[in-house]
Amino acid sequence: MVTILQLLVSILILLSFALVVGVPVILVSPGEWERSKNLVYASAGLWFGLVIVTAAFNSFVI
């Protein structure tokens, strides 16, 4: 159980880092927002879902 929680947290950290670096680059690049808008929204939705799943799973571990 703890290993799964550690894996979820690691994925959350990696996705957070990718979003922190990637979203500003997409917003600054000319014309990139129109092409990558769906990817940004999908990544943000995945991040939010991962936060909820990690929090729910954490309540079972501790």
Curated annotation (Swiss-Prot):
One of its GO terms (cellular component) is photosystem II reaction center. GO terms for biological process: photosynthesis; photosystem II stabilization. Keywords: Chloroplast, Membrane, Photosynthesis, Photosystem II, Plastid, Reaction center, Thylakoid, Transmembrane, Transmembrane helix. InterPro entries: PSII_PsbZ, PSII_PsbZ_sf. The chain crosses the membrane at residues 8-28, 41-61. Its main location: plastid. The keyword Cell cycle does not apply. The keyword Glycoprotein does not apply. It is found in: Plastid, Chloroplast thylakoid membrane. It is a multi-pass membrane protein. It comes from the Eukaryota. Disulfide bonds: none annotated. Belongs to the PsbZ family. May control the interaction of photosystem II (PSII) cores with the light-harvesting antenna, regulates electron flow through the 2 photosystem reaction centers. PSII is a light-driven water plastoquinone oxidoreductase, using light energy to abstract electrons from H(2)O, generating a proton gradient subsequently used for ATP formation. PSII is composed of 1 copy each of membrane proteins PsbA, PsbB, PsbC, PsbD, PsbE, PsbF, PsbH, PsbI, PsbJ, PsbK, PsbL, PsbM, PsbT, PsbX, PsbY, PsbZ, Psb30/Ycf12, at least 3 peripheral proteins of the oxygen-evolving complex and a large number of cofactors. It forms dimeric complexes. This is Photosystem II reaction center protein Z.
